[in-house]
């Protein structure tokens, strides 16, 4: 549906949220520009890590996240079918004890129930499939999303076909708010927009004291995360995924970055060993990431991760060979239930998106649209509002506000200061 009022929209951040929103808002008739500080789009976690298109069991303690995942998954697959990677198997396993010897954070009954929220779920015999140390395991029809060049090339074609200009190597220093516009300040100058969308992964350009203004007192941490890269020596026509739940357990995901058959690239992550630090500021997490090198990863991280995966999948290292590592800094909500859906809000004409799971880009966009329409109404509609009072754009409140607010001084020779009767009575 195209909108009655065409707005100039500037989007900062060329990851999943930024690129998807650019396409959706262009379809609605807005003029859209995209700004990415790196040399290419999808240079963060969404373009480099193997990413699950969640059906929900990953979050057994957050029904809200599971419901959001299932709702968003259907819409995502309908929107980007060419980027959906279907799996031979997607195993969710319930571990006996995590890396610290602790039991799972959920009971086996609860774990089974959340897996069977997906109607195609089937129970798997762990030992018959080469696994150990598991209470139970289930196979779901759960895909992942393509990454790397396959993802970038798909979106470059889509953005180009839509006529959306992408500013690369464009670091946005600040967003300047005025009464009717927002200006994006880069090293090349200023760009004027009606609406700016901050899709930087909640890492920059945030309003001062925004935590105090939000309707919920949310906790945020910035985590330095890495993934170990492996090559499958026995590639199949379709890839597989394997995760142990719920606590400090390992996970294996495919990292599909081409359309070639028999994909070999996988990543190994862990609930604790590949989350290397949690910080109050993104910059602190980036400092840790920048300090890492292959020697540090090989000596301090890789042995723990391989010990953990082989506790549950003894044949892993016989099939997969280590090829390196990659890292990123991610914003994460601090919640007891591990809530992971996105949050979207607007302040001063800037819409900010706190990222959730990749499929949440669809639902985040659905929230952005009414926020943009509300901005259009406030700035370009026929009704204005001030402190709860509404009036039309033809009202003198709007057209002559300065003039009607300019009041005469006390005692000034002015009709509004006349006291004629009192003066006549006094004179007599």
UniProtKB/Swiss-Prot annotation:
The record marks 421 as: Important for catalytic activity. Kojic acid can be used for several biotechnological applications, including use as an antibiotic, as an additive to prevent browning of food materials, and as an antioxidant. Kojic acid is also interesting as an inhibitor of tyrosinase. Finally, kojic acid has also been shown to have strong nematicidal activity. Its cofactor is FAD. InterPro entries: FAD-dep_OxRdtase, FAD/NAD-bd_sf. Keywords: FAD, Flavoprotein, Monooxygenase, Oxidoreductase. One of its GO terms (molecular function) is monooxygenase activity. GO terms for cellular component: cytoplasm. Induction: Expression is controlled by the kojic acid gene cluster transcription factor kojR. Expression is also positively regulated by the secondary metabolism general regulator laeA. Expression is negatively regulated by the transcription factor kpeA. Nitrogen deficiency increases the expression. Expression is also regulated by the kojic acid related proteins kap1, kap2 and kap6. It is an enzyme of class 1 (oxidoreductase). FAD binds at residues 52-60, 328-329. Disruption phenotype: Leads to the loss of kojic acid production. Leads to the declined expression of kap6. Its EC number is 1.14.13.-. Pfam families: DAO (PF01266). It comes from the Eukaryota. GO terms for biological process: kojic acid biosynthetic process. Belongs to the aromatic-ring hydroxylase family. Probable FAD-dependent monooxygenase; part of the gene cluster that mediates the biosynthesis of 5-hydroxy-2-hydroxymethyl-1,4-pyrone, also know as kojic acid, a by-product in the fermentation process of malting rice that acts as a chelation agent. Glucose might be converted to kojic acid by a combination of dehydrogenase and dehydratase reactions involving kojA and probably additional enzymes. Improves the antioxidant capacity via the accumulation of kojic acid that is also a strong oxidant. This is Probable FAD-dependent monooxygenase kojA. The lineage of its organism: Eukaryota, Fungi, Dikarya, Ascomycota, Pezizomycotina.
């Amino acid at each position: 549906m195209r909108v009655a009022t065409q707005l100039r929209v500037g989007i900062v951040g060329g990851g999943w949220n930024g690129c998807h929103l650019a396409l959706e808002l262009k379809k609605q008739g807005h003029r859209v520009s995209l700004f990415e500080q790196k040399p290419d789009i999808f240079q963060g976690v969404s373009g480099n890590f193997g990413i699950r298109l969640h059906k929900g069991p990953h979050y057994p303690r957050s029904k809200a996240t599971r419901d959001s995942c299932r709702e968003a998954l259907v819409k995502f697959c309908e929107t980007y079918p060419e980027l959906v990677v279907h799996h031979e198997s997607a195993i969710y396993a319930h571990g006996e004890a995590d890396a610290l010897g602790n039991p799972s954070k959920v009971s086996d009954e609860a774990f089974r129930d959340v897996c069977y929220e997906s109607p195609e779920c089937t129970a798997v015999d762990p030992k018959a499939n080469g696994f150990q140390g598991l209470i139970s395991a289930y196979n779901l029809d759960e895909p992942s999303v393509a990454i790397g060049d396959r993802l970038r090339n798909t979106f470059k074609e889509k953005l180009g076909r839509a006529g959306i200009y992408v500013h690369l190597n464009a670091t946005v220093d600040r967003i300047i708010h005025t009464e009717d516009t927002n200006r994006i300040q880069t090293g090349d100058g200023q760009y004027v927009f009606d609406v700016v969308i901050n899709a930087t992964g909640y890492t920059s350009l945030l309003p001062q004291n925004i935590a105090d203004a939000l309707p919920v007192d949310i906790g945020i941490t910035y985590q330095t995360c890495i993934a170990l890269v492996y090559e499958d020596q026995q590639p199949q026509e379709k890839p597989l995924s394997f995760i142990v739940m719920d606590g400090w357990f390992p996970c294996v995901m495919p990292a599909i970055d081409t359309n070639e058959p028999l994909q070999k690239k996988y990543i190994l992550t862990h609930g604790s060993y590949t989350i290397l630090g949690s910080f109050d500021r993104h910059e602190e997490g980036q400092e840790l990431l920048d300090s890492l090198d292959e020697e540090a990863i090989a000596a301090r991280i890789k042995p723990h991760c391989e010990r953990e995966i082989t506790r549950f999948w003894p044949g892993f290292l016989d099939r997969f060979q280590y090829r390196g590592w990659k890292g990123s800094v991610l914003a994460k909500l601090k919640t007891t239930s591990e809530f992971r859906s996105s949050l979207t809000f607007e302040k001063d004409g800037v819409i900010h998106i706190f990222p959730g799971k990749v499929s949440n880009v669809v639902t985040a966009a659905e929230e952005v649209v009414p926020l943009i329409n509300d901005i259009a109404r406030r700035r370009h509609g026929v009704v204005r509002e001030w402190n709860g009072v509404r009036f039309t754009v033809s009202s003198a409140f709007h057209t002559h506000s300065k003039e009607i607010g300019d009041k005469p001084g006390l005692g000034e020779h002015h009709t509004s200061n006349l006291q004629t009767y009192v003066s006549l009575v006094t004179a007599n």
